[in-house]
């Protein structure tokens, strides 16, 4: 991300314009404000480092997570972890004192790494959305490629290469191409900070294009899910009318109040969305808000994915012997039970699809919320050379951008059942051994 002079004290020519900076470069924060800001920054660092470290440790502890789509989540966690472990800590004393004290060499390294990590984080989000898009719209070919780990590694490497090429060469060579550096002593920001043409080009590649791509992929997933839902509903209606009342047997016993659930103990019920009726494909896990790639194959549930799980509802009555013809009453009972089972599955999947749609909307909204203010203010600030955007708005915008690295572990892995189980294995191993299913909720509570 573009680093501003901490107080916005640079005019168009790059000369110092404030008496405070000339006197010592201090920001002018009171002791109380300095303590509050330092505490908030430390909290952001801890949240970013721990959240993403937990994702990386999960890959070490649970080999079942090492699938192609989850590798992309690992790539995202690595970039976000380094943001919290390297980029933010070096910037904290700079923003609190208004002066860079680590030297010009470390300044260059910090800028290259910061720009690289932020861009790679964005590109990884695009890659995750694209992978989910393929898992839903091209499920057959996608499943066939799940064993090709080299393909995933190539995509991950491409993300880092593109992220470096976006800003790295410009940061390293700008002062040599322009005939000298315009950055005063005690400051650290990119030479192209006020070059509007470069920034609009870079912003298009770093934010506008990725944002539109993520929106397109997730909207396509939503429309695909809605289309398949309508097809299932239409197929259920075309199955034929119910038999007349006089041909119908007495209704089966009333099912439990929670469709698709079974007792879990202590008066609770466990949803069967991972085990029974309406089981979703790994790419969009049922009940997990559809976040992140699954640990299995990444394909969304097909219209026939629950044929095996719903077979209990379509078993023939025991009175039917092998080779005997079913009576009209038995046939109507079987047909009715099948229709009830299909109706349950359709309602369950419709509820799941709504959750998936909401989760996809959250992903796009959070990404846009964290990146749009910074990108727009950066372009406006460059156009007017820093005179039309208050400094506190600009600094708030890129702290919001950094906060995206702390939010990503929540949006993607932590909302995924297989990752939560791996985290429970790390944090609450004893509870997982005693209560392998119920311990998940208890541990996270």
From Swiss-Prot:
Q: Where is this region: Disordered?
A: 234-259, 273-336
* UniProt KW Glycoprotein keyword: yes
What InterPro entries does the entry give? 7tmA_HRH3, GPCR_Rhodpsn, GPCR_Rhodpsn_7TM, Histamine_H3_rcpt
Q: Which UniProt keywords apply?
A: Cell membrane, Disulfide bond, G-protein coupled receptor, Glycoprotein, Membrane, Phosphoprotein, Receptor, Transducer, Transmembrane, Transmembrane helix
For bias type Low complexity, the affected ranges are 300-312
Q: Where in the cell is it found?
A: Cell membrane
Q: Which residues lie on this side of the membrane: Extracellular?
A: 1-39, 92-108, 178-196, 381-396
Q: Which residues carry this modification: Phosphoserine?
A: 439
**Positions of glycan attachment:** 11
UniProt cross-references to Pfam families, sorted A to Z: 7tm_1
Could you tell me the membrane topology recorded for this protein? Multi-pass membrane protein
Bilayer-spanning residue ranges: 40-60, 71-91, 109-129, 157-177, 197-217, 360-380, 397-417
Q: What Gene Ontology cellular-component terms does the record carry?
A: plasma membrane
Give the Gly residues compositional bias ranges: 289-299
Q: List the disulfide bonds.
A: 107-188
The record's section on SUPFAM superfamilies has: Family A G protein-coupled receptor-like
Q: Membrane side Cytoplasmic: which residues?
A: 61-70, 130-156, 218-359, 418-445
Q: Which family does it belong to?
A: Belongs to the G-protein coupled receptor 1 family.
Q: What is the purpose of this protein?
A: The H3 subclass of histamine receptors could mediate the histamine signals in CNS and peripheral nervous system. Signals through the inhibition of adenylate cyclase and displays high constitutive activity (spontaneous activity in the absence of agonist).
Q: What is this protein called?
A: Histamine H3 receptor
